Amino acid sequence: MIAVDNKGSYGEGLPPYSGAAIQVKNLWKKYGDTEAVRGISFDVNKGEIFGLIGPDGAGKTSTFQILAGVMKASSGAADVLGRPARQMRSQSGYLTQGFTLYPDLSVAENIRYVGALRGIDPREIDRRGQSYLEKFDMLRFRDRLAGRLSGGMKQKLALVCALVPEPGVLLLDEPTTGVDPVSRREFWDALAHLAAEGLTIVVATPYFDEAERCHRVALMHAGTIRQIATPEQLRNSLGLVRLELFTPQLAETELMLSEHAGDGSIADVQRFGDRLDLLVKRPEEAKLIVAERMAAAGLDSAEVRTDMPTLENVFVVTSRKLGEEIHAVPFPHRRDHHRLHGQVAIGARGLTKEFGGFSAVRHVDVQIRYGEIYGLLGANGAGKTTTIKMLCGLLEPSRGEMALAGQAGGFRSREVRQRIGYMSQKFSLYDDLTIAENLDFFSSVYGVPHQDRPEKMRWILSFSGLDGRQGQMTGSLPGGWKQRVAFGSAIMHEPSVLFLDEPTSGVDPLARRAFWSMINQLADRGAAVLVTTHYLEEAEQCNRLGLMVAGELVAEGSPAQIKAAQKGHVLEYVVDQPQRAADFLRIEGERWRVALFGDRLHVVTDEDALGAEQATTAKLNAFGIRVFQVRETRSSLEDVFIGIVEKARLEGKIGAEE
């Protein structure tokens, strides 16, 4: 739980300042002949959460470093609280992508160390540290080693360390990479509270579901800002409607409709795990055109739903107009797994793993077929990592039966290993080798024929956007580029079974589309793909999903089936005091049912939608909160996931982190 005091203490000790908290005017940053930031201008208001969205190399990190005062601009102005950013370094809390806690120090010791570096009195450090630990429900962990915290708790501790100096602005560069959905929502709830108390927050994120939680968003491209608006304004600016087509013939329908994309009737076609998304100007006309084309191609008719565009749609369409879209590079296929299509590639019955008296995985039954993309989801500690290690033969189960790539045993044999591709989140490449040396090593490990290696390596370099840079040290690559090389290394031998652990973590939106286009190609050619991801917007790309809670598989089906199976409605409220309304409703009911998305409030109810809307509106009005608009919106996978996890917690199946 996050306590609220509304002290408004951020930036204390400074003379009163009533203007925009951040003012950027005609800002430029050059590195030699490279223009990383090109004349950008924007303001950020006090108490605002402002998002910076853009592909790798757009200039986001350079902008952050200038705002934090750690790097000089080439020209232009960047003011923080009315003064040049270089003079206000003590008033900027900057959480970088690579922010490192000290794993061998306790939570309290990490806080004291950071406070001491900023010259804060030790007693004041302890007072502030205790206050923030209470605010973020972490006080009971103050003596725990930072290295023993979950990913979400580590991010909260990093946030506390950034807040101890009580900055006037907070700069967060991709703060939730690798954090599970429950922890991400808690982190963003914390940011919303801080903003309501008057702290100005600027966030860079590659994930559009997070951008939806910002008050305003700036779209960056090649060092420039193309658009600044609220998420709703950005969606409306497209002038397009999104059609969701549900059909079992995804690949065939995508290929047929993609040939017509851009002809005036269809602006974009994007494939997901159980549907296609089309962007169209005139939805009713487009529905008729799509139905006619599908019938002419001999394809089954599709169920069609209408919805608003997403922020990702805005970003992709804008990028395409600017010529920034990443086009899929044809993969040099040498193998075809079509003959295996539909057979079981990964199977488990009664899979159980115990460590001493602790059951990490209990009685899991799963079948993943060739040609299928299966997503395994779960919060930290749910058992999915242990399950994957067993399914790919790295860990012996305590009980249960398994089959992998047509074998019931001998999973570590060379024969089985050469049928499998594995991309680990924590280790995939050797940083002290060049890109070419890494690719040469993995091509040898996976047994890629010598005559095929040059072509496969050229493909990986092209797919990764690293043509001509094969001699570069791998450790010098930004995270997104390194992920692309690691993915290429895992598929160069064209495995029939592919394990991907957080494959697009930290990858920019355009590259993420290219990733999934390639994953779909592999599945279309018969490969079985098992994916883990913490980003539920991305889980929509899977054909089927399995959701784990407390070591058990509690839900399974297509994304649409999982959402449809969960009871309840999601109501979106536009009110005059969103944070106060959220705090009030969380006290009135279960906290997980309420979430802030910028200035909009989402409330999950199991009751009749109309009755719940009227009752909640009456409560808010009685509490002095004006309700301007209410509408029912569709449940997202995040809503469903968090609902399942929190209900399991209420039933005592899982507990709070200890």
Q: What do these predicted regions represent?
A:
Residues 76-88, 400-408, 415-416:
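Conserved ABC transporter NBD signature motif
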Residues 145-149, 473-477:
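Conserved ABC ATPase signature
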Residues 170-173, 498-501:
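Catalytic Walker B motif of ABC-type/P-loop ATPase nucleotide-binding domains
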Residues 112, 116, 123-141, 440, ...:
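Conserved ABC ATPase "signature" region
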